[in-house]
């Protein structure tokens, strides 16, 4: 029997910082996170909505040079790469009658996109206040036809709100209303890139029902189930019979490999993901210190900017059957307590379903 935890560091502000963890074991058999889940949500309840898919699974786009901040271009391109590497969706700059116009709206700090393929020359606004690839994926998934996770019909099983939604202004009601037409495709994952953060100081944000997931909400990491719901909706599949381990499935972008839950790797998800290390749990505590250095990206004018995506370190902790592994995060060097742990942190995989996001920690307050 093996357990593992994933060390995450976003390539934005955590440069070469240390995280110190202690690993141990005790003689107790314990089953964690055995709850059953309903399937995920998507707007697709009528013939009208079905026409909002992109033809031939290809999204055409162009950058509107008169009003686009090219410092965020890398974020969008990386987001497209992430989606196309895990699904059958392709992004093309070939001219098309129906395409997305990429702009940067300087009048707002918000980024936004229209839901699904809705018209010619439709809008996708992305500016420097958004910047990261994770936020760009969020908006691109809207463009593919998906609503927020917290607008699912089953969201009240996982979230609660401080105020009745009808007390909010119209803008926020639109962001939190449950859409009439939905199809549940994958389990609810509060770590979805489509889930808004848990902001306890903001009256209109959702609050998690389970305290351990507080810093998981608002993630900038694309969840396993985010890719799977795209593949299901766009009917992406592989003709071969590749056998995938550990709940993986054949990757429609490369049918010789599997899409694996975070922490698993190799062509068939039978190995530990790389880079990483494997430890053997013992009856006494072991100290482990991990350092990740994200580095920077440089523009042509030598302007130095944070990176747009995460780097990862995957640790497997091996233990005999009928043993429970104990993990204690001792400290973060300059860790930041931010919703979604968007500047880096640790995810300790505790869910029985390894495809679901587990609790994330990013500072002493959460560890």
Swiss-Prot record:
Predominant location: secreted
An example molecular function term from Gene Ontology annotations: metalloendopeptidase activity
Span of domain Peptidase M12A: 41-237
Role description: Metalloprotease.
Catalytic site: 139
EC number: 3.4.24.-
Swiss-Prot/TrEMBL GO biological process terms: molting cycle, collagen and cuticulin-based cuticle; proteolysis
Transmembrane as UniProt keyword: no
Coiled-coil zones: none
Glycan attachment sites: 56, 85, 169, 241, 254, 287, 322
Entry GO terms, CC: extracellular region
Cofactor(s), by name: Zn(2+)
Domain EGF-like: 232-270
Protein name: Zinc metalloproteinase nas-22
